[in-house]
């Protein structure tokens, strides 16, 4: 029987290799502001989600070091035992005050936060409605939950309206900014549509810190307040982890019944301390968003006439190429020129929509953007 495991694993790996869809870890020596180093060669890094340039910021590094000196290296237990400290409580309070919620529940990753929410909240009689392009963590959780899951066409509020049933206990889930396409959900229209008919949950992993007043995210920018808001700390915060923002009752429910929370070791308190500092930097250092906006405008101006360009209002700039081979080839050619841009292929994106996923951060310069555009133009002209 054990040979079946081996055979099945080998078959799956061979099929992925044959389809040229194998993904491999990229061993990096270190990263710096807007750059990364691999085997002693420096590349411009246009594949990072560090939108505000905080991941290598000296002020944030110092905050983590201060947290280590004060709280030690790890939490030592789950939050429900002895793993919850004053550093965690301060982070929760900061998030609630900033984003306007009664409770914030911390998780080790956005993936675990999304899975915990859908596994815990949904029951067999419930209806889960998800945008077709939602993140894999949401889709997988929806498929494994006891609820009936239906997907509405991407950003299509009319299709969502057709799927909503007033008699059902419904949860509508969308991302604020979609991670592979860089477009924004029509949150105001969705919120109006679901009002008093369903709960709304927004995963704002790629909007928090970047959009809205004081970086409060997609929902604040759209003027809405969903019942559940998920924010993650691996993008604009420059760190790792996630939080679920909700009312007091939902927060208590998650604390009691969300297994990802109850049975996982709490994030290190030094990390929570650094995250609180990152949240305050995001709110107070508006120059980072202003600088990012200037760089996004520069990118659009330099690239709009190059084949494959897709306009977005966010730091995520998909460059659609279609085939996986085309995306891999373009990524390789850019790397040869010292520019690191990842090729995104199925199953991460639908078949026929392979792309370069270019991300702009506040740590870049306009000179670096111009260099990227010149090389993109060269690669696209060569391929056509």
Swiss-Prot record:
Key words, A-Z: Biotin biosynthesis, Pyridoxal phosphate, Transferase
Gene transcribed to yield this protein: bioF
Residues binding substrate: 23, 135, 348
Annotated positions of the N6-(pyridoxal phosphate)lysine modification: 235
Cross-referenced NCBIfam families: bioF (TIGR00858)
Superkingdom, taxonomy of origin: Bacteria
Pfam (any one): Aminotran_1_2
Function: Catalyzes the decarboxylative condensation of pimeloyl-[acyl-carrier protein] and L-alanine to produce 8-amino-7-oxononanoate (AON), [acyl-carrier protein], and carbon dioxide.
The organism of origin for this protein: Vibrio cholerae serotype O1 (strain ATCC 39315 / El Tor Inaba N16961)
Family recorded in the similarity comment: Belongs to the class-II pyridoxal-phosphate-dependent aminotransferase family. BioF subfamily.
GO biological process, one term: biotin biosynthetic process
Enzyme class: transferase
Signal peptide: none
Pathway: Cofactor biosynthesis; biotin biosynthesis
InterPro entries attached to this UniProt entry: Aminotrans_II_pyridoxalP_BS (IPR001917), Aminotransferase_I/II_large (IPR004839), AON_synthase_class-II (IPR050087), AONS_Archaea/Proteobacteria (IPR004723), AONS_Proteobacteria (IPR022834), PyrdxlP-dep_Trfase (IPR015424), PyrdxlP-dep_Trfase_major (IPR015421), PyrdxlP-dep_Trfase_small (IPR015422)
Reaction it catalyzes: 6-carboxyhexanoyl-[ACP] + L-alanine + H(+) = (8S)-8-amino-7-oxononanoate + holo-[ACP] + CO2
Gene Ontology MF terms in the entry: 8-amino-7-oxononanoate synthase activity; pyridoxal phosphate binding
Subunit structure: Homodimer.
Record flagged with keyword Cell membrane: no
Entry EC no(s): 2.3.1.47
Protein name: 8-amino-7-oxononanoate synthase
Keyword Transferase on entry: yes
Record-listed pyridoxal 5'-phosphate binding positions: 110-111, 179, 206, 232
Cofactor: pyridoxal 5'-phosphate
């Amino acid at each position: 029987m054990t040979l079946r495991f081996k055979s099945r694993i080998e078959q799956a790996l061979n099929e992925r290799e044959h389809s040229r869809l194998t993904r491999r870890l990229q061993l990096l020596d270190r990263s710096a502001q807007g750059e990364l180093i691999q085997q002693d060669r420096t590349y411009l890094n246009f594949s990072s989600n560090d939108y505000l340039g905080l991941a290598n910021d000296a002020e944030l590094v110092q905050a983590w070091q201060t947290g280590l000196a004060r709280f030690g290296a790890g939490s030592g237990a789950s939050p429900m035992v002895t793993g919850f400290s004053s550093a965690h409580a301060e982070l929760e309070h900061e998030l609630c005050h900033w984003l306007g919620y009664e409770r914030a529940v911390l998780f080790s990753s956005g993936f675990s936060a999304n899975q915990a929410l859908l596994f815990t909240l949904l029951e067999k009689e419930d209806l889960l409605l998800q945008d077709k392009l939602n993140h894999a963590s949401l889709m997988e959780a929806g498929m494994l939950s006891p609820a009936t899951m239906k997907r509405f066409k991407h950003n299509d509020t009319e299709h969502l309206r057709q799927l909503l049933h007033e008699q059902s206990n419904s949860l509508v889930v969308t991302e604020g900014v979609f991670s592979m396409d860089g477009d924004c959900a029509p949150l105001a229209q969705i919120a109006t549509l679901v009002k008093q008919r369903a709960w709304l949950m927004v995963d704002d992993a790629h909007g928090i810190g970047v959009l809205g007043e004081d970086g409060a995210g997609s929902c604040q920018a759209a003027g809405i307040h969903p019942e559940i808001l998920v924010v993650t700390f691996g993008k604009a915060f420059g760190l790792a982890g996630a939080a679920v923002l909700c009312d007091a009752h939902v927060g208590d429910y998650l604390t009691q019944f969300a297994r990802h929370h109850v049975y996982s070791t709490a994030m290190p308190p030094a990390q929570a301390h650094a995250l609180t500092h990152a949240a305050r930097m995001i709110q107070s250092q508006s120059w980072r968003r202003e600088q990012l906006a200037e760089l996004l405008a520069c990118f659009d101006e330099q690239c709009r006439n190059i084949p494959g360009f897709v306009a977005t209002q966010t730091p995520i700039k998909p460059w659609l190429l279609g085939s996986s081979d085309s995306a891999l080839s373009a990524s390789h050619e850019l790397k040869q020129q010292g520019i690191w841009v990842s090729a995104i292929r199925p199953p991460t994106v639908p078949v026929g929509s392979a792309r370069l996923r270019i991300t702009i951060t506040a740590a870049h310069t306009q000179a670096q953007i111009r260099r990227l555009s010149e090389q993109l133009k060269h690669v696209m002209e060569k391929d056509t």
